[in-house]
A protein has these predicted regions:
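Acidic, polar low-complexity linker/tail segments
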Residues: 1-20, 25-35, 109-116
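Short N-terminal helix-initiation segments at or just after the protein's N-terminus
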Residues: 3-13, 61-72, 96, 100
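…and closely analogous acidic/polar surface helices at protein-protein or active-site interfaces
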Residues: 17, 27-59
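DG-centered beta-turn motif at the end of beta-strands
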Residues: 22-26, 37, 64, 104, ...
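A generic "cationic amphipathic patch" detector
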Residues: 49-50, 54-57, 77, 113, ...
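Short beta-strand-loop
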Residues: 57-88
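A broadly tuned preference for mixed-charge, low-complexity surface segments
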Residues: 69-78, 117-123, 127
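Von Willebrand factor
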Residues: 72, 83-119
Length: 127
């Protein structure tokens, strides 16, 4: 799945870097807290895209996992940062972090994650 870049002196393989947003959407995050999370993530996207553009050795792939009463993928498949768009999340329910970790762990196995991938980045946002 590695994309090959043409460079002077030969080709360089771009390795996938999986970045996971793991967002607490339980009732305790209602109001200002989930608003701050939505704003923070939205604000980071351009910076992440710039960093990815300046690093030809990695292909930044984004996924979002939310949890409250249960857990589910907001972004079901990895999306290139340049194609990623954030949709604001709402809060309500109880905190089911265990279910989120189960869904996440299934995606961190090889496969579906490739052994050529860089170590993943996991960002947990919760109160």
């Amino acid at each position: 799945m590695a994309e090959t870049l043409k460079r002077p002196g030969g080709e360089l393989a771009s390795r996938p870097l999986h970045f996971f947003w793991i967002v607490d959407c339980s009732g305790s995050m209602f109001g200002e807290k989930i608003g701050a999370v939505n704003h923070a993530i939205q604000s980071t996207i351009p910076e992440m895209a710039d960093a990815a553009e300046n690093n030809p050795n990695a292909q930044l792939l984004i996924r979002t996992l939310k949890f409250s009463t249960g857990a589910s993928w907001v972004t079901s498949s990895p999306v290139k940062i340049e194609d990623f768009a954030w949709d604001d999340l709402d809060a309500g329910g109880v905190t089911d972090l265990g279910q989120a970790f189960e869904l996440l762990s299934a995606q961190l196995m090889i496969p579906p994650m490739t052994d050529r991938a860089l170590p993943p980045v996991l960002v947990l946002l919760s109160d």
